[in-house]
């Protein structure tokens, strides 16, 4: 080995955090040292510090994957308004994710078959929201404000879908009425 320690946390993030300065200041006051001025680093430190409860503090649009190498877990999350999409496939060997369903379906290890039931539902009802299923069999999506907690310690990945913690939306947390997405 090179003697360089492997970082505990890794983040794949697509989005924009509107309250970056506020969260960055709070984390810095708690001893977090920042190396960049990028909101991606704020998201990484917030998730490392607060876990999934950090999602309730985020104001912005995002889709993310946060890996904890010590616990061998992966958090997938999507913003409450669903501005940034997130698709995934999981089987006994792997988890594949991307911001577009055809990218997941086109992965060489993902069987690409049409989801005929979803195609029929889409064509007969003109629905644009299909829950977690997509037009590709085995490719799922996170609904707005949803997260997937993935554990990789056993014989195959275990994925639990649930609603992400929600905070208050508005100019500042704690002011005004709470708005549900």
What are these regions (language model features)?
Residues 1-181:
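Cysteine-centered catalytic environments shared across enzyme families
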């Amino acid at each position: 080995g090179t003697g360089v320690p492997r970082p505990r946390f890794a983040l794949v993030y697509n989005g924009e955090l509107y309250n970056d300065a506020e969260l960055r200041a709070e984390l810095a006051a708690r001893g977090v040292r920042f190396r960049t001025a990028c909101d991606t680093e704020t998201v990484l430190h917030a998730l490392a510090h607060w876990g999934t409860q950090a999602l309730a503090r985020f104001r912005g649009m995002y889709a993310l994957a946060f890996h904890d190498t010590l616990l061998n877990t992966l958090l997938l999350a999507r913003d409450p308004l669903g501005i940034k999409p997130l698709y995934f496939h999981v089987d006994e060997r792997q988890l594949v994710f991307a911001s577009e369903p055809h990218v997941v379906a086109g992965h060489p290890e993902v069987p690409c078959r049409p989801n005929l039931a979803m195609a029929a539902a889409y064509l007969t009802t003109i629905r644009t929201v299909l829950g977690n299923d997509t037009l590709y069999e085995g490719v799922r999506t996170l609904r707005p404000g949803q997260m997937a907690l993935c554990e990789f310690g056993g014989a195959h990945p275990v994925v639990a879908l649930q609603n992400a913690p929600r905070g208050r939306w508005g100019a500042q947390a704690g002011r005004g009425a709470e708005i549900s997405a």
